[in-house]
UniProtKB/Swiss-Prot annotation:
Top-level taxon of the source organism: Viruses
Subcellular location, record wording: Host nucleus
GO CC terms: host cell nucleus
Protein name: Tripartite terminase subunit 2
Keywords attached to this entry: Host nucleus, Viral genome packaging, Viral release from host cell
Phylogenetic classification of the source organism: Viruses, Duplodnaviria, Heunggongvirae, Peploviricota, Herviviricetes
Complex and partners: Associates with TRM1 and TRM3 to form the tripartite terminase complex.
Organism the protein comes from: Human herpesvirus 6B (strain Z29)
Family according to the record: Belongs to the herpesviridae TRM2 protein family.
Function: Component of the molecular motor that translocates viral genomic DNA in empty capsid during DNA packaging. Forms a tripartite terminase complex together with TRM1 and TRM3 in the host cytoplasm. Once the complex reaches the host nucleus, it interacts with the capsid portal vertex. This portal forms a ring in which genomic DNA is translocated into the capsid.
């Protein structure tokens, strides 16, 4: 029988109930990427990074190619302005740009 003392959380009570039944549960994580990527991205860290970059690319594509009001829109706009500004300064320092209007930092 479960001990319903007020000190225990619902999760702890559920855990006790499951353990009393004596059953073992197997947790399986199915791959989200095709098998080809297992060769290209051998480590779990590389695969997670690949997925993260993919999600950022999707957010960027939505920002650039459509008037989508998503959570990332403002962040992307700020990062694009910052990146453009940094590139402009680097190119000016190296004397590559003769005219500032090539990169609009506004």
């Amino acid at each position: 029988m479960m001990d319903s003392s007020p000190e225990k959380t619902n999760l702890e009570l559920l855990y006790e109930q499951v353990c009393e039944q004596g059953r073992e549960f197997e947790v399986v994580f199915y791959p989200m990427l095709p098998r080809l990527y297992e060769m290209m991205l051998p480590s779990l860290e590389a695969r997670l990074n690949f997925l993260s970059v993919g999600y950022r690319h999707v957010a960027f594509s939505r920002y650039v190619h459509g008037d989508v009001d998503c959570v990332h829109r403002e962040v992307m706009a700020q990062k694009m302005v910052l990146l453009t500004s940094i590139l402009s300064k680097l190119l000016n320092v190296n004397g590559i740009l003769e005219h500032q209007e090539y990169l609009n930092t506004e």
